[in-house]
């Protein structure tokens, strides 16, 4: 996910960070979910479908955590942020504890 999304999320009042900023770039699947949970995160956003599906398997052990697959098409950072903002304005991003959800729905 483009790092520029962090600025938008913070602007929207969402506490967020990028895995790379935390030194988690090498973590995969359940290990990344565990690291996120251990530092107080309740949700992970990803554009990678295979990663999201794999990480969601860890949800059986962490039923209060959610994985959200962002299905906005791959474009450059600034354009992605524009599309993310537009989607946010028309559709709530609602993580569901213990689940993998796709957002925005219908994409």
Please name every model-derived segment.
Residues 3-11, 30, 53-107:
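Acidic, PIN/NYN-like endoribonuclease modules and their adjacent C-terminal/linker elements
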Residues 29, 36-58:
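Acidic, metal-binding active-site segment of PIN/NYN-like and related structure-specific nucleases
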Residues 1-27:
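Active-site-proximal, substrate-binding regions of enzyme catalytic domains
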Residues 34-37, 89:
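Surface-exposed alpha-helical segments enriched in charged/polar residues
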């Amino acid at each position: 996910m483009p790092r520029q999304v962090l600025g938008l999320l913070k602007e929207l009042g969402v506490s967020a960070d990028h895995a790379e900023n935390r030194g988690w770039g090498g973590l995969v699947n359940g290990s990344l979910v565990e690291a996120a949970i251990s530092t107080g995160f309740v949700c992970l956003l990803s554009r990678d479908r295979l990663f999201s599906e794999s990480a969601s398997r860890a949800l059986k052990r962490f039923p209060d955590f959610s994985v959200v697959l962002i299905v906005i098409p791959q474009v450059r950072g600034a354009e992605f942020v524009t599309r993310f903002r537009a989607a946010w304005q028309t559709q709530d991003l609602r993580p569901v504890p213990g689940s993998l959800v796709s957002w925005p729905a219908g994409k």
